[in-house]
Amino acid sequence: MEKIIIQTKRRTEFVDITGEIERILKSKNVKSGICYIFVPHTTCGLTINENADPSVRKDIIEKLEQLVPENDKYSHTEGNADAHIKSSIVGHSLTVFIENNSLQLGTWQGIYLCEFDGPRTRNVWLKILP
C-alpha cells in the first residue's frame, strides 16, 4: 500500500491529487491494472471531476453547502456534522483503471481529495494491483 499525506488549507476545498497518484504509479511500472484509492477519514472524501475549469469545483462546493449547511441543526454537536454528511454523499474511495502505466481518466478528469472539515492533515491510501 502507498500513502499520500495532504495538508489542507481551508475548511472546505477540493485538492487535485492526480499528479501525486501518477508519480507513485510511474515508480511501480504497472502496464495494466487497477488503482484503488481510499481516504480513512469521516469528514473528507474523494471524487473524479473536471480539472480544467476551477469554477466546476466551486459550483460543487456551493451546491453541497446549500444541501447540507454548516450551521444547520444536527444531533451531532461537535461542529462538523455537515462534514460527515457531505463526505458520505461524495464517498471515500475510487477505482481507476491503469493502462500503459497511466491512469485511465477522461481528457478533463482529475482526482480530488474533498475536504469538508479542514484545515487538517489527510491521508490518502493507494493500492495498485497489476
Model-derived features: positions:
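Active-site histidine-anchored catalytic micro-motif
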Residues: M1-P130
